[in-house]
Amino acid sequence: MTSIAAAARPMFSFRNLNIVTTVIASLLFLILLGAPDIAWWLFGIEGGESADFVARRTAMLFAGIAALCWFTRNTPAGAAQSGIAKGLALAMVGLVMLGLTEWLRGFAGIGILLAVVTELALAVGYGRMACYPSGR
């Protein structure tokens, strides 16, 4: 195997990447549903009834992401795995762009960078998984 091929190979298997994503999405579900003030504090933004309303709805999306990742963690390489990886990579890239934009415009505090770094790592992981679906 050439060094270029070895460098392009994903560090995590699809299964392990999905398990990590399940844990992160489950934690976000619990925080946003039960204690959204933690997110407001971390991101340095103002909470309130409207923000809490959106947080509860967002929590359910994270529950769905957690379930999707958990129940598809053993999906073999192929079209389904590639589609899941591409969809999650797209979502993570979008979150990275939004997080950086909100931080640069001064709306979100420095804590948003924790989310951005995590989302970027997931975007790279799923992006590489989409390019090299067998996880060789």
Where on the chain are the PLM-derived regions?
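Membrane-helix boundary connector in multi-pass membrane proteins
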Residues: 96-114, 129-132
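Short, Lys/Arg-rich, polar N-terminal cytosolic tail immediately upstream
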Residues: 1-14
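Hydrophobic alpha-helical membrane segments
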Residues: 84-99, 118-121
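Membrane-helix boundary elements
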Residues: 14-20, 25-52
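Juxtamembrane helix-break-helix junctions at the cytosolic face
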Residues: 69-82, 103-104
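Core segments of alpha-helical transmembrane spans in multipass integral membrane proteins
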Residues: 23-32, 51-74, 86-94
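Membrane-water interface at the C-terminal end of transmembrane alpha helices
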Residues: 121-136
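Non-cytosolic membrane-interface motifs at loop->transmembrane helix junctions
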Residues: 45-52, 82-83, 107-118
